[in-house]
Structures are given as C-alpha cells and as structure tokens.
Amino acid sequence: MSTMNKEKLKGLQSFLKDDIWRVTEDEVSKSRGIFYNAIKIATLSIREFTQGRIINKASALTYSTLLSSIPILAILFAIARGFGFSNLLETQFRSGLEGQSAAAETVLGLIDSYLIHAKSGIFIGIGLIMLFWTILSLTYNIERTFNYIWQVKKPRTLYRKMTDYFSILLLLPLLIVLSSGISIFMTTMLKNMEDFVLLAPLMKFMVRLIPFILTWGMFTGLYVFMPNTKVKIKYAIIPGIIAGTAFQAFQYLYIGSQIWVSRYNAIYGSFAAIPMFLLWTQISWSICLYGAELCYVAQNLKNYSFSKETRSEEHTSEL
C-alpha cells in the first residue's frame, strides 16, 4: 500500500473516530448532515447494543418465549376458531415451519391438548389463570427490556397491561388472516394475468413484497407501542424496515437450510425442533432489540452532546 493511501486511510479513521462527532448540522449541507447522522446512529446503536449486553436480554426473552409459546398460540387459535378462520391460521403456521413438518404437527397437537385441558372439568379455572399469567409474564419481560433500552424506569400499570396486550392478541389473528388473504388474492390475480407480459413481473414483485411490508409494519408498531414512553413514529420507520428486512432474510435462510436441519435431526432425533426453535428465537429477538436500539438512538441523537475539545460525549435521554 502506498504512503498516500495509508495517509488517506489514517485520515478516514481519524475522521470517523473523532472529527465526525464534532460536526454540527449547521456546518455541513443537509444531505451530508443526514449521511453523518446515519454513521453516528449506526455507531452509537452498535455500542449501546454491545455495552448494554442486549444479547443477554435476547437470551432471557428466548427463555420466556419458549415457556409462553404454546399458551400464546393456543389463545391465537382459540380466537381464530371463534371467528371461523382457524384453517387459514393453521396454514400460515405450517408455512412458517416449512421443512419441519414433524415439529409443526407436534406443536399443533400440543395446542389442541392445551385448549382441551384449559376448558375441561375442574381445571378450567386453573388452566385459564395459568394461561393468562404466562402471557402477561412474557409481555412484561418484553416491555421491561424495551424500557431498559429506552431508560424508562416506570412500567405500565396492570390495567394498561391487561387492556393493551390482550387487544394485540385479539388483533394478531385478524392481521395474520388478512395477510394470508392478500397473498392468496395477489397470487390468484397473478395466475390470471400471466398473458399480460408487462404487468406480470410487477405483480410477482408485489406478491413477494407483501411479507416484507407486513413485517416492516409489525416491527415499526412494536417500537412505537412497546416502550412505556412516547416514541415518534418517524424515528421508528427506518429501524422497523431494517429489522424487518433482516428478519425476513433470516427467515429465508432458516427455511432454506435443509442440510443444516437434517444434521440436527440426525443428532437430536425427534427433539431436533427444540434447539432449532431456540436458535431461531434467539436470533429473532437479537434482530428485534437491535432495531429498538436504532430507534432509541435516532430519537435521542440530538441529546448526545459531543465536545469539540475532547473525544468524550455526554448523553441525556429524551423521554
């Protein structure tokens, strides 16, 4: 490497390490200011994610999710059956576990068993209490993690937890069925428009884009709704898109790794679904929580005061 290139590289490193933190929006053009802010947000979010040990928080949520997965799915399927679209929800669930049909059948069997025992005989009261307690426990842990990221000390009241979280549980099956209906509608239209050479590629693109749009909306809503503080939606949209895209990419990688899954089947046999589910949940929560860090840093970037004379920065949270 030539001396000139070394000097340029050294200058770039110095700029990214020190100088960029001293630049204010008034000193540069609007486009360059946006670019610099993006670098600051990415750097600070990674630092907060690692120093805050958010991976450990993701592991704790993975454990809570493992304990709560069957009760939550049981409630979703019970609501779906009440509205008469349990078959659509089951289809979506099976497609989500594509390549692991045995695991899907096992989980569906556990859901049916859970619903039967929760509403039969003397166990109906205990079963319902345990079901609601399990769900409240998971949602409390999720809110506590988001509040930790946002440095919020006060959680929701019990009344707000009951109303807010169970409203989500009522809406979630409807959203799943709506997404399934849109996908079926678009696919049907695509088959009928195969003769239209110009429109067919556009329709294919729209069908493939639907899961991404729904995932972007889900993460954006989560970042706005879950912390017990005011989160401006404009700061949640881009983190929601980034996290949603990463989540969808991981989904495709996870579903497409048939050789990887078969190796686990050879080692664990019928229990192979458990480590795979743990791995999927851990990575999914890590993606979700990093997006929450992005959202937090984006909204509070102006509250990081960077000294022009020193390399240190001070921070106050906007809550």
Predicted regions and their residues:
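Membrane-embedded alpha-helices and immediately adjacent juxtamembrane helical segments
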Residues: 2-317
